[in-house]
């Protein structure tokens, strides 16, 4: 008796993994650490990491844009962690700034090898500043929000503080702390934690018109650490 031939169903082709922004960033950071240099071309980088050039260009126009976005991601992740603390909304501005810096440098420490590579690899300050442009904008915006909150609580206009000066000061403070952290050889980077506390307290004390003792204390700390 004739029977119908069994047909073999066509094999399903494996669905290609969707490449995310996080995948590209992780692949780039791994690449520079494993090869101790930056990739020469998007084509070669993509091929080595099982993605297409289109996958890369979906998120970044070039490697410069990727490097900037890594710093933006550090900031975003820092704020996400801070806001997960239910008490954060009730913190004073001083406490919010301390929380920001402590969390940011904890994150940098988790990625210390990459951060040291990318900043030291670009020896010229302008190159460093180029990849930090987005971070600078975020930090200044964060500081501006804090000073706006403070000014809203002041009934006397003479007691209000300059948003521009304060936000720029916060960025200069960030650069100083990054350099301090890069050179810090203390266990657990405890000296960086001390620098964060003293610098933030000094900045807020200056803005609260009680600068002298705090500035002197911070100055002595810096002198001791740099001269040790």
Language-model region placement:
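Amphipathic alpha-helical packing segments from all-alpha helical-bundle domains
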Residues: 129-154, 164-176
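Helix-turn-helix
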Residues: 37-69
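Basic, helix-initiating cap at the start of DNA-binding domains
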Residues: 2-31
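Acidic/His metal-coordination segments adjacent to aromatic residues that form catalytic metal sites
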Residues: 90, 152-158
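An amphipathic alpha-helix adjacent to DNA-recognition modules
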Residues: 18-26, 57-83, 87, 94, ...
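C-terminal peripheral helix-coil segments that are non-catalytic and often amphipathic
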Residues: 2-8, 183-228
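Hydrophobic alpha-helical segments that form the core
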Residues: 161-180, 194-202
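Helical hydrophobic small-molecule/effector-binding pocket
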Residues: 97-119, 134-147
């Amino acid at each position: 008796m004739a029977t119908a031939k069994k047909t073999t169903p066509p094999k399903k082709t494996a669905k290609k993994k969707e490449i995310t922004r996080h995948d590209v960033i992780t692949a780039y950071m791994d690449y520079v650490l494993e090869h101790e240099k930056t990739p020469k071309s998007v084509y070669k980088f993509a091929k080595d990491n099982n993605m297409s050039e289109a996958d890369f260009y979906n998120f970044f126009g070039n490697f410069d844009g990727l490097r900037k976005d890594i710093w933006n991601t550090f900031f975003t992740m820092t704020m996400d962690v801070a806001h997960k603390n239910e008490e954060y909304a009730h913190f004073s501005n001083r406490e919010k700034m301390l929380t920001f810096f402590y969390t940011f440098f904890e994150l940098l420490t988790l990625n210390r090898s990459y951060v040291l590579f990318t900043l030291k690899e670009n020896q010229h300050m302008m190159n460093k500043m180029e990849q930090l442009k987005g971070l600078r904008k975020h930090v200044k915006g964060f500081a501006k929000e804090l000073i706006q909150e403070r000014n809203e609580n002041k009934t006397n206009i003479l007691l209000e503080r300059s948003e521009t000066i304060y936000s720029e000061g916060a960025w200069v403070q960030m650069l100083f702390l990054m350099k301090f952290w890069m050179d810090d050889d203390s266990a657990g980077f405890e000296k960086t934690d001390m620098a964060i506390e003293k610098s933030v307290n000094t900045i807020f004390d200056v803005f609260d018109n009680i600068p002298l003792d705090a500035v002197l204390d911070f100055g002595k700390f810096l002198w001791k650490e740099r001269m040790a």
